[in-house]
Amino acid sequence: MFWAAFGEQMCTGLVPLDGDPESRRGGVTGDIINILYQSFLPDLLQPGDIFMHDNAPVHTAGAVQATLDELGVEVMIWPPHSPDLNPIENLWALMKQKIYQLYPELEHAPNTTASKELLIKAAKDAWNSLEDRILVRLSETMPNRVRAVIEADGWYTKY
C-alpha cells in the first residue's frame, strides 16, 4: 500500500506502507496510519485546510479519528464508496498507467521481494513524474465534483 497527499499548492512524496505482520490479515493498521499522520500532517496542513482520505476502515478507526482530533485536523465527511469525490483516485489510475509504461515487466511479475522492491521504485518514479498542472487541475475540480454528485442524486458522474 502507498500513501500520498496533494492539494492545489502542495504534494507529498509517495510513502510505501508495509503491513503489520502481527495484524489479523497482515495489512496496514490504524497504528501505522497514526504514525504516518503524526509525522506528516502537522507540517502539511495549513489553518483552514480540509483533509480528505478514503473511508477505508483503517482511516476511520477510532484511534485514527482520535489522532486527527488531537492534531486539530478538519476531515471532509463524505459517503463511502464515492471515488467521484476523491481526486486522488484519478492520480492512482494515472500512476498505474505510468508504472506499466515505465516498467512493463511488473504487469506479470511474481510476488517476490525483488518484484516488491521494483514496484516501490516504479511507483516513486511514476509519482515523481506527475506534472504540477495535473495536481492543480484535479484540485480545482472539487467544486464541480460536489455539484455533479448532488445533481446526480448521489449516482455516478463523469469523475
Please identify what each model-predicted range represents.
Residues 27, 55-58, 110-114:
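Intrinsic disorder
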Residues 61-71:
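Short, aromatic/basic amphipathic alpha-helical patches
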Residues 88-159:
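C-terminal anion-handling pockets and recognition modules
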Residues 21-22, 76, 105-109:
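Short interface patches used for recognition in eukaryotic signaling and trafficking proteins
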Residues 45-60, 82-86:
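Acidic/histidine-rich, metal-coordinating catalytic segments
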Residues 1-47:
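Electropositive, glycine- and tryptophan-enriched low-complexity nucleic-acid-binding patches
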